[in-house]
Amino acid sequence: MNSDVIKGKWKQLTGKIKERWGDLTDDDLQAADGHAEYLVGKLQERYGWSKERAEQEVRDFSDRL
């Protein structure tokens, strides 16, 4: 997971993140503040995914940046 890319461009990415995962709230994204592991946890919580699935989703997202 390229968490450096996510952290470094967090403010620019929040719109794309909300497009991809619309169940995440502005508060979720503000609290995550670019931390991929927090984002993974929120995806698990909001979508009921396993940790592995949420990590893969974030990995796929960051690979497309």
Curated annotation (Swiss-Prot):
Disulfide linkage: none
A Pfam family reported for this protein in Swiss-Prot or TrEMBL: CsbD
Tree of life domain: Bacteria
InterPro entries noted in UniProt: CsbD, UPF0337_stress_rsp, YjbJ, YjbJ_sf
Family label: Belongs to the UPF0337 (CsbD) family.
Identification of the protein by name: UPF0337 protein PA4738
Organism this protein belongs to: Pseudomonas aeruginosa (strain ATCC 15692 / DSM 22644 / CIP 104116 / JCM 14847 / LMG 12228 / 1C / PRS 101 / PAO1)
